[in-house]
């Protein structure tokens, strides 16, 4: 089995990474950061997001597993004291592969049709660089839907619906559903300006095209990465054809994670 390990970079995570590498030598597992079959992140959900972006070019050929050295995460489901068990499972087991939907973002510029393509595991947001009101036309499936005015828009995946989207009042969506969700960030609603005022859930075959009305510099975030764009013509969002693959060696139910993260006090029986 070819593997690679990405660490959060703190002392605890780095020590655990080196411990795992030494232990994996006993199983004749090969460390191969260029062509891994399994990508192990040690840290938290942020570390796994970084691992996803680093290996997004080979999603069909590798699977991800997370070890959390801090708080319980939605993606990192193994504890530091379980690493030896995990290594044995990786070496001996045919692991189950669970696939989650991703978000495709295509930024189109006014410069001779130039465009860039990105993938997000959690969400993408769109705002103005200087914090002024974002004014954009929202087009769904080729039809004008609304003119949005506000701080910005957040477009999330099902697994990302528990992150920024939840803080914006969006719905929680099970990752088995291939969909994306659009949530407003502080929209302006009065007698003159109106938006739908509710999160929108779009299925896989629906595309959302967002066109800036003014030529402001647009600030986008794609998971943990912030990018400034000038001279933007439009940004297209849809459910990506690619999916992220997680290696599962034991059950890790989505709704239990939601309960443990947002409801459980730690004292539940």
Swiss-Prot record:
Active site location: 45
Binding sites annotated in the UniProt record for NAD(+): 45-46, 122-123, 149, 151, 186
GO molecular function terms listed in the Swiss-Prot or TrEMBL record: ATP binding; metal ion binding; NAD binding; NAD+ kinase activity
Localization in the cell: Cytoplasm
Keyword terms: ATP-binding, Cytoplasm, Kinase, NAD, NADP, Nucleotide-binding, Transferase
Source species, domain of life: Bacteria
GO CC annotations on file: cytoplasm
InterPro entries recorded: ATP-NAD_kinase_N, ATP-NAD_kinase_PpnK-typ_C, NAD/diacylglycerol_kinase_sf, NADK
Any Pfam family matching the protein: NAD_kinase
Any single GO BP term: NADP biosynthetic process
Co-factor requirement: a divalent metal cation
Catalyzed reaction equations: NAD(+) + ATP = ADP + NADP(+) + H(+)
Keyword ATP-binding attributed: yes
EC nos: 2.7.1.23
Annotated function: Involved in the regulation of the intracellular balance of NAD and NADP, and is a key enzyme in the biosynthesis of NADP. Catalyzes specifically the phosphorylation on 2'-hydroxyl of the adenosine moiety of NAD to yield NADP.
Listed PANTHER family: NAD KINASE (PTHR20275:SF0)
Membership in a protein family: Belongs to the NAD kinase family.
Protein name, entry field: NAD kinase
Species name: Staphylococcus saprophyticus subsp. saprophyticus (strain ATCC 15305 / DSM 20229 / NCIMB 8711 / NCTC 7292 / S-41)
């Amino acid at each position: 089995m070819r593997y690679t390990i990405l660490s959060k970079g703190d002392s605890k995570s780095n020590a655990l990474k080196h411990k795992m590498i030494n232990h994996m030598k006993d199983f004749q597992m090969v460390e191969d950061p260029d062509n891994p079959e399994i990508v192990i992140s040690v840290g938290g959900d942020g570390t796994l997001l970084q691992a996803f972006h680093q290996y997004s070019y080979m999603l069909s050929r590798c699977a991800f597993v997370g070890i959390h050295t801090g708080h319980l995460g939605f993606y990192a489901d193994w504890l530091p004291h379980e690493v030896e068990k995990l290594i044995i499972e990786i070496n001996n087991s045919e692991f189950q592969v669970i696939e989650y939907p991703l978000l495709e973002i295509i930024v189109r510029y006014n410069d001779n049709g130039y465009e860039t393509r990105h993938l997000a595991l959690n969400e993408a947001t769109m705002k103005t660089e200087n914090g002024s009101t974002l004014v954009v036309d929202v087009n769904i499936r080729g039809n004008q839907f609304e003119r949005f005015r506000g701080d910005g828009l957040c477009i999330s995946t099902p697994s990302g619906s528990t992150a920024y989207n939840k803080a914006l009042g969006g719905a929680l969506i099970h990752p088995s559903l291939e969909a994306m969700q659009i949530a407003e960030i502080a929209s302006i609603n009065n007698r003159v300006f109106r938006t739908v005022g509710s999160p929108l859930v779009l299925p896989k075959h629906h595309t959302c095209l967002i066109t800036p009305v003014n030529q402001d510099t647009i600030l986008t975030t794609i998971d943990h990465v912030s990018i400034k764009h000038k001279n933007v013509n439009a940004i297209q969002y849809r459910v990506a054809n690619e999916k992220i693959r997680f290696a599962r060696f034991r059950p890790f139910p989505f709704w239990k994670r939601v309960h443990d993260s947002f409801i459980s006090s730690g004292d539940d029986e």
